[in-house]
Regions:
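Alpha-helix N-cap and loop-to-helix initiation/capping positions
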Residues: 43, 193-201, 231
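Surface-exposed loop/turn and secondary-structure junction residues enriched for glycine/proline
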Residues: 48-50, 198-200, 219, 228
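A charged N-terminal "starter" segment
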Residues: 1-174, 178, 204-207, 211-217
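Active-site-proximal beta-alpha loop/turn segments in soluble metabolic enzymes
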Residues: 181-194, 220-231
């Protein structure tokens, strides 16, 4: 089992990365002199290079477009920006330039969604994938969003209690997804694929809570895979 910080870095990043360049012992990022930034603002320093956000979103879209054509796949690819990666307004505004949808992870993310709707930056056609463990306020906020007409808000069911909790607060019918626990073999102590409904319990869970439930319709299966699937 690898437990050192360098193991986490090696697990998360591939080196070298094209964004970085060493120029006479000074590090540049997208041709930005990082030494000058540190001299100006001090260190530690965190900044966001906005053009790369759109570049990566569109790169992902091209990958999927090519794969869909290659395999004659009949479905569509919808890119969802995960708010927990950054809640900063300037980051969200850059991402939203690219015809995307949104994934939320907590109660205040729904407040952000409602603000974006008020500003006209998203609308009822925007998919809002509500992921994560749902405490009481998160349940209430999701229900409020759906009750106010955002039928494209799809809560991802993370455990056996969430359907009942949501149904108690959502007035009409609504769509759901199921988070499937990948149950991959943990190769690191930094293991994050533990949440969701286990493979063996999917059908019993569906038959018991979804199949005969007139309020909910299953629209999505959600997998979180950290280092890949082994068949």
């Amino acid at each position: 089992m690898n437990t050192k910080y360098i193991d986490l870095i090696n697990q998360t990043f591939d080196f070298p990365q094209e964004e970085f360049l060493l120029d006479k012992d000074y590090l540049r990022f997208h041709d930005i002199d990082l030494n000058k930034l540190v001299e100006t603002y001090g260190a530690p320093l965190k900044f966001t290079y906005l053009p790369k956000i759109s570049d990566n979103i569109n790169k992902s879209k091209v990958w999927f477009e090519n794969a869909i054509k290659k395999h004659s796949y009949n479905g569509n690819y919808n890119y969802c920006y995960c708010t927990k990666s950054s809640h900063f307004k300037h980051v969200l505004n850059e991402a939203l330039k690219n015809d995307i949808h949104i994934e939320t992870s907590s109660a205040f993310d729904i407040d952000i969604i409602e603000t974006l709707k008020e500003e006209g930056k998203i609308n009822d056609d925007t998919f809002v994938i509500s992921n994560g463990f749902k405490r009481a306020q998160y349940i209430t906020n999701i229900a409020r969003l759906i009750n106010n007409g955002h039928q494209n808000c799809i809560p991802i069911i993370d455990n056996y209690e969430e359907i009942d909790l949501l149904s108690n607060e959502i007035y009409g019918n609504y769509n759901i997804g199921i988070r499937i626990a990948s149950e991959e073999d943990p190769k690191f102590e930094f293991y994050t694929s533990r949440l969701g409904i286990g493979y063996k319990n999917i059908l019993p869970f569906y038959n018991k809570q979804i199949k005969g439930n007139p309020k909910v319709e299953l629209k999505m299966l959600h997998f979180f895979i950290n280092t890949g699937i082994r068949d």
